Amino acid sequence: MGRVLDLGAGNGIMGQVMKDYGVARMIGADIIPEAKKACIRDSPGVYDEYYVADFTNLKPELIEEISEWSVDCLTTVAALGFGDIPTKAFLQALKFVQTGGWVAFNIKETFLNNSDTSGFSRLIRELIFSEYLDLYHLERYRHRLSMEGIPLYYYAIVAEKKSDIPEDFLKTFKIDE
C-alpha cells in the first residue's frame, strides 16, 4: 500500500493506526473544518495533506490535485451509512482509487440486509456484488454496546477495485445521492 485516502478522517485516529503499520503516504479528508483542527491537535503530522472538502461537489482543481496522489487505498471508518458521508461522496472518493487498489471500511450489519433500502445500503450491495469491486474480506464484529448495553454489530469490509465505476452508477441503480 503506497498512498491512502482516509475519508471522514476526523481527528486522525485511523491515520495514526495506518502510520503505526508502516503506511508512509496518507491523505485525510473531512467535510468539517473542526475535524482538521482536531487532527492537528490530536494527530499532528499523520497526514501528508488534509482536505476540508465536500466530496459531493469537488472543484475540478481539487479533483485534479487528489488524482495526482495516485491513491491506491481508500479507508473510511465509522462514517458510512448515517448521512455523515453521502453515497455520492463515497463514490467520488472510490473513483480516486487506482484500479487494483484497495478499499477498507466498516458498516452497520443491517446495511448488508436486503430489507434495508437506504441509498447507502443499496450502493454497498451493488458495489460488492459487481465487477467493480472484488470482495476480499468480510468480517462481522461487535462494534460497541448501545447505551442500553445491547451489542451493536458491524461488518469490516475489504475489497479490491477491479475497474473504474461509471459516472452514471448511482442513476443506473436508482440510488439516492
Segments and roles (model prediction):
Residues 71-86:
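A short SAM/SAH-binding and catalytic strip from SAM-dependent methyltransferases
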Residues 61-74:
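A short acidic, Gly/Pro-enriched loop at the edge of an enzyme's catalytic core
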Residues 5, 11-62:
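Class I SAM-dependent methyltransferase SAM/SAH-binding core
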Residues 100-108:
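Conserved beta-strand signature within the Rossmann-like core of class I S-adenosyl-L-methionine
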Residues 88-99:
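A short glycine-rich, Lys/Arg-flanked "PGG" loop and its adjoining helix->strand segment in the class I
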Residues 56, 108-113:
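Short "lid" loop at the C-terminus of a central beta-strand within the Rossmann-like core
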Residues 129-177:
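Class I S-adenosyl-L-methionine
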Residues 115-131:
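Short alpha-helix
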